[in-house]
A protein has these predicted regions:
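A structural-propensity feature for long, helix-poor, extended segments
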Residues: 17, 21-33, 249-274, 278, ...
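Membrane-embedded alpha-helical segments of transport systems
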Residues: 22-27, 68-80, 88, 132, ...
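Membrane-embedded alpha-helical modules
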Residues: 64-180, 291-444
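Re-entrant/interfacial helical elements at transmembrane boundaries that shape
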Residues: 1-4, 21, 32-52, 83, ...
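Flexible loop linkers connecting adjacent transmembrane helices
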Residues: 34-62, 87, 96, 186-189, ...
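Membrane-interface alpha-helices at helix entry/exit sites of multi-pass transporters
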Residues: 11-15, 52-69, 239-252, 280-283, ...
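Transmembrane alpha-helix interface/packing and boundary motifs in multi-pass membrane proteins
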Residues: 1, 23-36, 111-116, 210-222, ...
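Helix-loop-helix hairpins and the membrane-proximal interhelical loops
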Residues: 1-11, 86, 93, 144-249, ...
Length: 454
């Protein structure tokens, strides 16, 4: 739909892009919660908490809470864009290649350590995701890697193909091998704003997660994945019931959705102030700017302030309209869980393959998606983590490019962390890993002493 926006007025075209993207971020939580299939790649973590809540008969509560958290993150992000854009834009350029590499590495470390009791498995699946991300042309010399002489692998493995395979197609396989189940969808009971009232009980998690989303959105190349895993890990570490995470924790759901939806508006801070796109959405917005001869940067706030204000208003209105529509239509959306599981499995399978094929009109992509579907099916049956594969693919590519760029500019490993932000991130990584090692060692000692005493 991007080319269609070129014929529209700049603010109308940008509003259309923001509306489509924002709606997908909100709406992506719906299948993630109801049928364990993320609507977008960044809703993958929502399945961890949303699906178990649905299985407990709390689908309405999960959806309402997800909408509320998304609205909180979105509005908070827009408020930061409006109030703090001149100040916050100065921070983004301080993140060079070294800082972005360390931020991405921190994201990988946190997602691995957040899988309690499955740290080794999460580490292995993260490494597998990183390896998948290296298939194709390497980014500096453009030589082929791990293509095994197959030309169709030269373009790499598309992230969307992997996401649909690991989550949607694998879930379809699970539904097809199960006996038909009929669930009765509960009504919206409790009013349209029940989720907002419940969100007040998790206001600390919502506020911190939204802040993580804003901070990560401002850093070019980091985005939703790092933000949601930082938020999710924070919520888990500070929760009074960390054992509930992965089993339908409202706190985990709030953390994931608030962080996701705080990123897009925050990514516009470096775009508007410096002309630097922070992620895919702002890269598309930049093309709309150029088509209409709008030059983002400090001069934008002086020469076209009315355009900037209109963009702010559009962002706020979009958040209100999307969440209002979703809250009103929740009863209808809940009817999805009344569909017999085998029929639902076939529907997911068909829609997934149609979606994969439509990406590049490639039957090979469908075969790759099917392969990852089988892998996801096996991992789910073995109760092994899947999300680290996606994070490894996304952050692994960022880490490689930034590491290679950084190493060309430093003379020794010590120089890699000789800047303040890089040093702080490095220390945080050491503290996080050290704390986990210490915790694991103490747990081992206690277990050993109790077994000796017994």
């Amino acid at each position: 739909l991007l080319p269609a926006t070129f014929s529209l007025d700049p603010i109308v075209g940008l509003t259309a892009l923001l509306g489509i993207y924002g709606s997908s971020m909100y709406g992506g939580a719906i299948p993630a919660i109801l049928i364990n299939t993320p609507g977008t790649a960044v809703n993958a973590l929502t399945t961890y908490e949303g699906t178990p809540m649905t299985r407990r008969g709390e689908a309405r509560r999960a959806l309402s809470l997800a909408y509320s958290a998304s609205f909180c993150g979105g509005v908070f992000s827009v408020a930061c864009l409006i109030a703090l854009s001149p100040v916050l834009a100065k921070i983004a350029p301080m993140f060079g290649s070294r800082e972005i590499f360390l931020a991405a590495l921190l994201g990988i470390v946190l997602v691995i350590l957040s899988h309690r009791g499955q740290v080794l498995a999460a580490g292995m699946t993260s490494c597998f995701g990183i390896w998948i991300g290296t298939i194709g042309l390497e980014p500096v010399k453009y030589s082929q890697r791990y293509t095994f002489g197959q030309s169709w692998l030269a373009g790499g493995v598309d992230l969307i193909v992997v996401v649909l395979g690991l989550f949607a197609i694998s879930q379809a396989f699970l539904l097809l091998v199960e006996d038909d189940k009929f669930s009765k969808a509960e009504g919206i009971g409790g009013g349209l704003f029940a989720g907002f009232r419940e969100l007040l009980r998790h206001k600390r998690v919502a506020a911190v997660s939204s802040s993580f989303g804003v901070a990560m959105g401002m850093i070019p190349g980091v985005g939703e994945f790092t933000a949601q895993f930082l938020s999710y890990t924070y919520a888990q570490k500070t929760s009074e019931a960390p054992e509930d995470f992965g089993n339908g924790s409202p706190e985990g759901l709030v953390a994931s959705e608030a962080a996701n939806n705080a990123v897009p508006a925050a990514a516009m801070i470096p775009l508007l102030a410096l002309g630097i796109p922070g992620e895919a959405l702002t890269a598309m917005m930049l093309s709309v700017f150029y088509v209409h001869s709008v030059v983002p940067g400090p001069q934008l706030f002086q020469s076209q302030l009315d355009f900037v204000v209109a963009l702010y208003i559009a962002l706020l209105i979009l958040n209100v309209l999307v969440v209002a529509f979703l809250l009103v239509s929740t009863n209808q959306l809940l009817r999805v869980i009344e569909i017999p599981t085998r029929f639902l499995g076939v529907a997911i399978l068909v829609l997934s393959f149609v979606g994969v094929y439509s990406l590049r009109n490639s039957a090979i992509d469908c075969a790759i998606a099917a392969g990852f579907g089988v892998l996801g099916f096996a991992l789910k049956r073995l109760s092994l983590p899947i999300v680290p594969i996606i994070l490894g693919m996304v952050l692994g590519g960022i880490m490689e490019i930034k590491l290679r760029t950084s190493m060309m500019r430093v003379d020794s490993p010590v120089d890699f962390i000789n800047r303040p932000i890089a040093f702080i991130l490095f220390v945080i990584i050491l503290i996080v890993v050290g704390a986990h090692v210490r915790s694991a060692w103490l747990k081992y000692r206690i277990g050993k002493e109790s077994s000796n005493g017994g």
